[in-house]
């Protein structure tokens, strides 16, 4: 009896502990459900581990080649942002800045004279062979990158002069002459909107440096290259397709051959048969001649047997 009562008490105690544990689990579950109702934003809240991962990036050639060295990480400073938005550049145009070797007064006077005499068309000039390399795509040298900004071109208003960032002589020393010794083939006069281009650049009769280059450009412009490397104009019209050898007589140096008839050859021959070449002449039978020769030299089998019988009978009769 005592054992059963002890067992009942132990079961009650275990049930009470289980019930208390279930109540605790229910309260913790509600708290966690309430806390998960408002999720945190991982983008707004950055942890220290993420910051460390951003600071220590992996070595990459295109991102930061010096990130692999520890000394560079210690001395690393935040880079300055030099790039400005295009909206600010468009809203506040910067006045044109001229090269130091060119006085701005002469440029303005030359530009006004050009605009008064027929409009400004040289800024939009682009030769046919320069579709891939226009003046707007050329970048200034390293000394002018931070100082020169061309003003925005206003197509609806009055024409605005866009200055060149540097003289042509800095970009291409011998821009007038191509590598074959010839000159450009498009426009042989420099643009008339500025005066410093003639003074500081070696024009050499060519507006753009690449307008007269390459062998492929000379093929479609009726020009050809000689042995000396220069260009010479091709003959226009149908004369290009004419040669003196076309009018010469092709039968001039040929000698005639007399023709012989087959009947004449047959009459002159001793056999009286028609003459035929050896390739198609009838061949004599070789087997008949061979058999005839062998038969004339040797006896046949019947003759040999008859002769042998005669000889045997003669020997018997003599004995």
From Swiss-Prot:
InterPro entries cross-referenced by the UniProt entry: SICKLE (IPR039292)
Region Disordered, annotated ranges: 1-59, 71-239, 262-299
Keywords, sorted A to Z: Auxin signaling pathway, Cytoplasm, Developmental protein, Nucleus, RNA-mediated gene silencing, Stress response
Compositional bias per record (Pro residues), positions renumbered to this chain: 93-103
Basic and acidic residues composition-biased segments: 228-238
Biased composition regions of type Polar residues, renumbered to the chain: 27-56, 78-88, 185-210, 285-299
Tissue: Expressed in the shoot apical meristem (SAM), embryos, seedlings, root tips, and root and leaf primordia.
Protein's cellular compartments: Nucleus; Cytoplasm, Cytosol
Keyword Ion transport among UniProt keywords: no
Protein's GO biological process: alternative mRNA splicing, via spliceosome; auxin-activated signaling pathway; circadian rhythm; entrainment of circadian clock; miRNA processing; mRNA splicing, via spliceosome; protein localization involved in auxin polar transport; regulation of alternative mRNA splicing, via spliceosome
Location (main, coarse): nucleus
GO cellular component: cytosol; nuclear body; nucleus; plasma membrane
Disruption phenotype: Developmental defects due to abnormal miRNAs and siRNAs biogenesis including serrated, sickle-like leaf margin, reduced height, delayed flowering, and abnormal inflorescence phyllotaxy. Hypersensitivity to chilling and salt stresses. Several symptoms associated with alteration in auxin (IAA) signaling such as increased IAA levels in shoot apices and reduced IAA accumulation in root meristems, reduced apical dominance and abnormal root gravitropism, growth and emergence. Altered PIN polarity and endocytosis in specific cells.
UniProt keyword annotation of Ligase present: no
Known role: Involved in miRNAs and siRNAs biogenesis and thus promotes gene silencing. Modulates auxin (IAA) transport-related developmental programs by regulating protein phosphatase 2A (PP2As)-driven auxin efflux carrier PIN proteins recycling and polarity. Required during development. Necessary for abiotic stress (e.g. chilling and salt) tolerance.
Oligomeric form and interacting partners: Interacts with ubiquitin thioesterases UBP12 and UBP13, and with protein phosphatase 2A subunits PP2AB1, PP2AB2, PP2A3, PP2A4, PP2AA1 and PP2AA2.
Name of the molecule in the record: Protein SICKLE
This protein's encoding gene: SIC
